[in-house]
Amino acid sequence: ELTYTLPPTLTATTGLDALTQLIEPFVCTRANPFTDGLCKEGITRVVRSLRRVVDSGQTVAARGSAGAPEIAAAREDMAVASLFGGLALANAGLGAVHGIAGPLGGMARAPHGAVCAALLPGVAAANLYALRRRAPRSEALGRYAKLAQLLTGDSGAAGDEVSKWLRRLVADLGIPGLGAYGVGPEHIPELVEKAVSASSMKANPVELTREELASIVESAL
């Protein structure tokens, strides 16, 4: 119930951070059956409920009401998904989104969830591109296809749908790019150098080059 009166923007950014913390352990190199179950269930709950809780926050702000019982169920979905993401990352790892977001947190006054939201679509696209070029037999390619199916509800969805779906979600929730927080092209070289050695980067499903990392940040501005 403490989440009912959160501003919609805060609900959106923290919800997208929770989603990131479910996606990254699912596709990372240390994914395992325990974390897979947590991630699949958590992602399903986010897909079902994130838009609803953001919309309900706007209703609360306007009318001062927590809304119908289904809103309580959606809030519970997001709380459970957040818990599952924490358990998953602790038992598998993260990836390039947090590998970049961690150092960026010390360079700019930007909300962590908003940073993750801005980076998430670009990282998904870059990982898929790199996997297909440099690791075409990687299990992670199948995981991205499964992720696409979880996000879209389409059993035939391919991995390319992940970044498209995420871009639409971030745009629909009104999350701005990193430029809104003062991050510009001049920050990219330093950020990339810090990201390369970030602990979260170690479990990314494929090693990304400095050029690829720079392109991700540029696309998130």
Model-derived segments and their meaning:
Residues L16, I43-V46, V97, C116-A117, ...:
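A general structural signal for well-ordered alpha-helical segments in protein cores
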Residues L83-C116, A198-A203:
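Glycine-rich phosphate/pyrophosphate-binding beta-alpha loops
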Residues P185-L221:
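Short, amphipathic C-terminal "tail helix"
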